[in-house]
Every structure is written in structure tokens, then in C-alpha cells.
Amino acid sequence: MEEKRQNRIGIITMYYNSSNYGGLLQAYALCKYLNDSGYPTKQITYDFYRKTISSSKDYKNLVSFLFKRLQKRTNNLIIKTINIIHGVSELRKDRRNICAEFRASIPHTETVYNDNSIEDCNNLFDIFIAGSDQVWNPDVFRPSFFLSFVNEEKKKISYAASIGNSITGKEMQSEYEDALNKFDRISVREKSDINKLEDLCKKRVEWVVDPVFLLTEKQWETVSSPVQLNINKEYIFCYFLGDDKRHREIAQKVAKMCNCAIVTIPYMQMNYRKCDSKFGDEKLLDLTPAQFLYLVKNAKGIFTDSFHATAFSIIFNKWFITFGRTDHPRMNERITSITSLYNCGDRCVLDYSDDVVQRIFDKCPLTTNCRYESQKALQLIGRSKEFLLSIGK
């Protein structure tokens, strides 16, 4: 009797050519968990940067499409000039190159697919997963992130997909409705996204954890890689995606109170920012995702506005403060969702009144012993694992 072949799983997320630490670490985690659970799993190397006219709805208005592209190129030229002046013109390429080894360590297709060739993946996989991360953000809408290329007889699942923004406009809502109704099962990372999607489609939407929580603290410790620091005292790690000067000022005050150095990764948007240029005792430009983990794990405390820096602060049981994004306030739902789940909502700062700032000072990293234990979180992790293990049945 011929032995039944195990279901092969293909994952589509923002993996290709990425230098985003959180994005790559969640991609690693989902592949790792599924492969360890007996499902042969790979990331689909999908070049989502190349948005063709035919694969977007922009072909309906070619003039508008070309104008937007010209406007973007003009803006990029201005930004590039500023970067050259301040010596960070090669930062994007450098970070992509230094993350290449970690990307390569994640099981993936050798072929790089685009919207015209991605249908070929139907020959490689039996089950397709969209997620995690912001694959369903309307600002980067791609039909392939909704598995539009997958044959009808194949299973279509989303795992911890995130919207990250509001789905506005009848045309966009209609596109989401059509795409979501073709899924076999849908799960999202933010609890607040459940009602948004269930209002659009006829499917049940489930809440699951980000893939990084599928692995244990010990597993992540084995992934981390040491960083050689040129400081001789304990440090606070600052990881800011936004450019709010107040976040950095508060971190500096706390570091001074605690006699800690500040270690930071500047220019996380790959462009020069004045708020980063004179901030921090040690600026690290060329780190791998594994070294990012090391900085979180060994810090005395963390200041951040990042979801995944918050997630790993929780995993490694570190003192942390997460600021809300003032430049993208709609993104704060993911932060409040995860801190609420782990009963540490007081670590999330969304306003900057005097009493809130004083509360941060009162919780000095050197005097705080953290342990984030939540029965609710453990139960959700368990349900998330059950969700994944059941997709092959």
C-alpha cells in the first residue's frame, strides 16, 4: 500500500528581499513550527515590490497610475539626495545584504515569483497560508496576498494576517469580501480585526498569536547571535520605527537615572532622520535579525514603538515601555492587543502627560523584576497551535 504523502505548505508573506527584523523573525517562526510539526513548509519567494498595472486595479485609470509612479520617483529622488548628504545612501542595500544569510536560513522556494508566474506554485504545494504580518494592509494591497493564484481544489488559509489600517471605499471593501470568501479558514493577529473582517465576509474569523509566540524563549535564545558593543556598562535598547522626538527624550532621561548607556538602531525607515542622528551612545547600522534578538535579550530595558520589539520583550521577560506611533496612530491596535493579552497594558504609553512620564521614571529598569505570565495568553497560544495542526486534516 502506497504511503500517503504529507501535505506540503507554502506560505506567502513579506519575505522576499526583506530587511525587516520582525517580518523575517515571524516568517522564520511559522516555517520552523510547521516543519517541526511534520508539515514540509516553505516561504514562497514572492516579489511583491513589482506591482504591475494588470495586477492592480490601476489599469482602470492609467493616467492616475503613471502620475502616482512619477510622484513617487520624484519623492524618492529628494530622499536619496538627503541620504547622500548625510552618508546613509547605501543603508537600504546594506541592510538587505546583511539580512541575506538569515533569509536564506528560512526554507523557501529557489524560484522568485511575480504576479505573472506565481500560479506555478500550485505544482509545489497542497496547502497555502497567507500571513503573518501586514499582508492584508490596504496600503499594500496585492491579490496574491489573498491567494488569488491558488487553484480551487487547494486549501487556502490565513494565519495571523494583519490589516494595519482601515478598509475604506466600496470598491476596496468589495475586493476584500470576494477574496476572503474564497478562504477555507481565516485567522488574524489583532482581535480588533475580527469584527472588521466578519462584517465584510460570510466567514468565521479566528484570533491567533503572532508566529513568534509559537516558539519558546529557549528556542529564540538559540537563534540569537552576539553583538560586540563598545560600551562598558549596562544598556537600554531603543528601537524606534517612528520619528517622535519625545520618545527619545524620555528614554534618555531614564537611561541617565539608571546610569545606563543607550544602544539604538537608527534610521529604521532606511532614510536619514534628524531625530536619530544625535541619539544614542552606540548606533548600530548593520545588524542581522539574530543580533536584534541578542540586543533585546541582554538589555536592561527596552524603549520601542514596534510590535515585534514589544513581543520579544515579553518573550524574554524584559522591562519595556512601548510608545504609540504618533505618525501612524491606527497601528497602535496591535500594541494594545498584545500588551492587554499579557496583562501588561501599563507598559503601553499612548499619551505624554506629566503623570504618565513620571510613572515611567518610577519604574526604573534596574529595580524591576519582570515576568509576563498570562493564562489567557497560554490558552491562545494553545488554540493557535491547534489551528495550525488541524489544517492538514
What are these regions (language model features)?
Residues 1-393:
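Active-site anion-handling motifs in enzyme catalytic cores
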